[in-house]
């Protein structure tokens, strides 16, 4: 027969050759990441391990595929195989191990900024659930390192102005915040720094009571000092045990060679005005001065400059006790008068001639006060023989 010509055909037993071109970034917060590989043949793509994709055809050259959505995890078993048009499968191409992380760091405050504070570069401590890079918002920056080195650690930073170097000015700060971005690029929710006040101004003495150069002060008068701003209560102290000049609030009649002992520590209802009471009472007709030492500090920790009254104040020259030939009278701190002894001529001022104080039960609170009139007080008293006189405040 005539020769039959067989149609031309090609035998191909060569499998495609694959190589990795652009691996998946690791760490990444992209849970549908891209991956680029090259193939020397076109064909059909199949996937192995923990990865898959809807991209199932390849070309001769570079091929970029997008993996289907992946959960947060480390992927180290993903493979790609290309089968050419005559069913020759390539060797599986191992995708370089990568990690998906879409979890944002969680921040919490550990130690807030003290407020008020006289520290212009105050510390602030917070906790982060992950390591990462710090960034700052609002009116604050930080001169500290920008990295949180490891998760679950407490991180102490030094706050500055937003340029990350200049100390904070005297002001109130209510808008400062911290954000930590983890290595995968996930930013935390901004952590708001507590509102705090920077105060570097020293307090001053606004007023004293008794006032400087005041006279006729009662020997039982309370001693008060009012400051220009809220004070640290622990720093306003006085001497309650002896006559040494200790404590930051002092009272003296001898230019502070010694000081008056006080009945108790200074008291205050507003941290502005502090009051003490001498124990025993002050002496009559004596000049005293009030001094506040540098040990007193405002609530931010700023020490006051020492303040001493220039002239001081003078206590009353009137001695409150007087005596006649057979009776005695005493002017109490509240301006009332009590008398005891012989009352033959009514010299006790009680409107009768009955002797008083014969028995102990008639003394003290049981001893009647002289009726001076409603709301009227005595300012001085004197007695002699069988009479008593008083100067009244009306």
Locate predicted features.
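Conserved structural position at the C-terminal beta-strand
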Residues: 82-84, 180-182, 292
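Acidic, low-complexity Ser/Thr/Gly/Pro-rich repeat segments typical of extracellular/periplasmic
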Residues: 49-69, 138-167, 202-316
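Short glycine/serine- and acidic-residue-enriched loop/turn motifs that recur at repeat junctions
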Residues: 341-363, 387
